[in-house]
Protein backbone atom coordinates (compact mmCIF):
# COMPACT_ATOMS: atom_id res chain seq x y z
CA UNK A 1 0.00 0.00 0.00
CA UNK A 2 1.09 3.49 -0.73
CA UNK A 3 1.58 6.06 2.04
CA UNK A 4 -1.47 7.88 0.70
CA UNK A 5 -3.68 4.80 1.22
CA UNK A 6 -2.29 4.27 4.72
CA UNK A 7 -3.06 7.88 5.58
CA UNK A 8 -6.65 7.51 4.35
CA UNK A 9 -7.08 4.29 6.34
CA UNK A 10 -5.83 6.08 9.44
CA UNK A 11 -8.51 8.77 8.97
CA UNK A 12 -11.44 6.32 8.72
CA UNK A 13 -12.07 5.90 12.48
CA UNK A 14 -12.12 9.67 12.98
CA UNK A 15 -14.57 10.11 10.10
CA UNK A 16 -16.83 7.36 11.48
CA UNK A 17 -16.84 8.97 14.93
CA UNK A 18 -17.73 12.34 13.42
CA UNK A 19 -20.57 10.82 11.39
CA UNK A 20 -21.96 9.11 14.50
CA UNK A 21 -21.92 12.45 16.37
CA UNK A 22 -23.89 14.33 13.71
CA UNK A 23 -27.32 15.06 15.21
CA UNK A 24 -30.56 15.34 13.25
CA UNK A 25 -30.93 18.95 14.45
CA UNK A 26 -28.10 21.42 13.97
CA UNK A 27 -27.82 24.33 16.40
CA UNK A 28 -25.15 26.84 17.44
CA UNK A 29 -23.70 26.98 20.94
CA UNK A 30 -26.23 28.56 23.31
CA UNK A 31 -25.87 31.83 25.17
CA UNK A 32 -23.71 31.76 28.31
CA UNK A 33 -25.79 31.23 31.44
CA UNK A 34 -25.24 32.64 34.93
CA UNK A 35 -24.90 30.58 38.10
CA UNK A 36 -28.14 29.61 39.92
CA UNK A 37 -30.38 30.74 37.06
CA UNK A 38 -32.55 27.93 35.66
CA UNK A 39 -32.85 28.04 31.89
CA UNK A 40 -34.76 26.02 29.31
CA UNK A 41 -32.54 24.02 27.00
CA UNK A 42 -35.24 22.60 24.75
CA UNK A 43 -38.90 21.67 24.71
CA UNK A 44 -40.16 18.40 23.27
CA UNK A 45 -43.90 19.01 22.80
CA UNK A 46 -44.75 15.48 21.67
CA UNK A 47 -43.35 14.12 24.97
CA UNK A 48 -44.81 16.99 27.06
CA UNK A 49 -41.27 17.59 28.32
CA UNK A 50 -39.01 20.57 28.87
CA UNK A 51 -35.25 20.13 29.41
CA UNK A 52 -33.96 22.56 32.05
CA UNK A 53 -30.54 23.22 33.45
CA UNK A 54 -28.79 25.31 36.09
CA UNK A 55 -25.12 26.04 36.64
CA UNK A 56 -24.64 25.52 40.38
CA UNK A 57 -21.20 27.00 41.07
CA UNK A 58 -20.39 23.77 42.95
CA UNK A 59 -17.20 22.05 41.74
CA UNK A 60 -18.56 18.58 42.61
CA UNK A 61 -21.75 19.05 40.58
CA UNK A 62 -21.30 22.11 38.36
CA UNK A 63 -24.56 21.67 36.42
CA UNK A 64 -28.00 20.40 37.42
CA UNK A 65 -30.14 18.93 34.62
CA UNK A 66 -33.82 17.97 34.87
CA UNK A 67 -36.61 16.89 32.56
CA UNK A 68 -39.77 18.75 33.59
CA UNK A 69 -43.34 18.09 32.49
CA UNK A 70 -44.70 21.03 30.51
CA UNK A 71 -48.31 20.78 31.72
CA UNK A 72 -50.56 18.37 33.60
CA UNK A 73 -53.13 18.66 30.81
CA UNK A 74 -50.65 17.76 28.06
CA UNK A 75 -51.33 14.40 26.39
CA UNK A 76 -47.96 12.94 25.29
CA UNK A 77 -47.55 11.37 21.87
CA UNK A 78 -44.02 10.28 22.76
CA UNK A 79 -42.35 9.00 25.90
CA UNK A 80 -39.30 10.40 27.69
CA UNK A 81 -37.30 7.52 29.22
CA UNK A 82 -34.33 7.25 31.57
CA UNK A 83 -31.07 7.33 29.58
CA UNK A 84 -29.27 4.75 31.73
CA UNK A 85 -32.12 2.24 31.43
CA UNK A 86 -32.66 2.75 27.69
CA UNK A 87 -28.94 2.92 26.79
CA UNK A 88 -29.66 4.47 23.39
CA UNK A 89 -27.34 3.74 20.48
CA UNK A 90 -27.59 3.72 16.72
CA UNK A 91 -27.20 -0.07 16.83
CA UNK A 92 -30.49 -0.24 18.78
CA UNK A 93 -32.32 1.99 16.28
CA UNK A 94 -31.95 5.25 18.22
CA UNK A 95 -30.93 8.45 16.42
CA UNK A 96 -28.87 11.25 17.90
CA UNK A 97 -31.50 13.97 17.65
CA UNK A 98 -29.82 17.02 19.17
CA UNK A 99 -26.64 18.20 20.88
CA UNK A 100 -27.17 21.27 23.06
CA UNK A 101 -24.10 23.15 24.31
CA UNK A 102 -24.44 25.84 26.97
CA UNK A 103 -21.37 27.67 28.29
CA UNK A 104 -21.12 28.98 31.83
CA UNK A 105 -21.01 32.78 32.15
CA UNK A 106 -18.95 32.47 35.36
CA UNK A 107 -16.49 29.95 33.89
CA UNK A 108 -16.10 30.35 30.10
CA UNK A 109 -13.88 27.25 29.83
CA UNK A 110 -16.73 25.02 31.01
CA UNK A 111 -19.93 24.06 29.22
CA UNK A 112 -22.87 21.74 29.76
CA UNK A 113 -23.55 19.38 26.85
CA UNK A 114 -26.90 17.61 26.55
CA UNK A 115 -27.26 14.86 23.97
CA UNK A 116 -30.87 14.06 23.09
CA UNK A 117 -31.61 10.69 21.49
CA UNK A 118 -34.82 9.73 19.69
CA UNK A 119 -36.21 6.27 18.92
CA UNK A 120 -38.46 6.75 15.89
CA UNK A 121 -41.47 4.54 15.29
CA UNK A 122 -43.27 3.89 12.03
CA UNK A 123 -46.80 5.14 12.66
CA UNK A 124 -49.20 4.58 9.80
CA UNK A 125 -52.31 6.62 10.37
CA UNK A 126 -55.52 5.49 8.76
CA UNK A 127 -57.46 8.38 7.31
CA UNK A 128 -61.23 8.48 7.06
CA UNK A 129 -63.29 9.73 4.11
CA UNK A 130 -62.59 13.33 5.11
CA UNK A 131 -58.83 12.76 5.19
CA UNK A 132 -58.69 12.95 9.00
CA UNK A 133 -57.07 10.55 11.42
CA UNK A 134 -59.58 9.72 14.14
CA UNK A 135 -59.43 7.67 17.30
CA UNK A 136 -62.71 6.18 18.49
CA UNK A 137 -62.87 5.54 22.22
CA UNK A 138 -64.59 2.14 22.11
CA UNK A 139 -62.21 0.82 19.43
CA UNK A 140 -59.21 2.12 21.37
CA UNK A 141 -60.44 0.41 24.57
CA UNK A 142 -60.88 -2.91 22.74
CA UNK A 143 -57.39 -2.65 21.20
CA UNK A 144 -55.84 -1.81 24.57
CA UNK A 145 -57.61 -4.76 26.23
CA UNK A 146 -56.27 -7.04 23.48
CA UNK A 147 -52.73 -5.69 23.99
CA UNK A 148 -52.66 -4.01 20.59
CA UNK A 149 -51.36 -0.66 21.75
CA UNK A 150 -49.43 1.20 19.08
CA UNK A 151 -45.79 1.96 19.75
CA UNK A 152 -44.87 5.58 20.33
CA UNK A 153 -41.56 7.37 19.77
CA UNK A 154 -39.20 7.65 22.74
CA UNK A 155 -36.67 10.24 23.81
CA UNK A 156 -33.73 10.04 26.21
CA UNK A 157 -31.14 12.65 27.19
CA UNK A 158 -27.72 12.57 28.81
CA UNK A 159 -25.92 15.58 30.25
CA UNK A 160 -22.16 15.92 30.61
CA UNK A 161 -19.99 18.84 31.65
CA UNK A 162 -17.06 19.46 29.33
CA UNK A 163 -14.07 21.72 29.66
CA UNK A 164 -11.84 22.85 32.47
CA UNK A 165 -13.30 23.88 35.83
CA UNK A 166 -12.52 27.35 37.11
CA UNK A 167 -10.94 27.88 40.55
Residue ranges: model-predicted function:
Residues 10-19:
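Hydrophobic h-region of N-terminal signal peptides that target proteins for export
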Residues 8-11, 46:
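A ubiquitous, low-specificity "background" feature that marks scattered single residues
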Amino acid sequence: MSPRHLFLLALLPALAATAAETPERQRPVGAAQAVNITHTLRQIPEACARLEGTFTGDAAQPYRFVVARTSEQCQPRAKFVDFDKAQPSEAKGWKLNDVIRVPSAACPTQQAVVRVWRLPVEQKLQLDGQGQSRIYLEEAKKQAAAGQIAEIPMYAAKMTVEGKACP
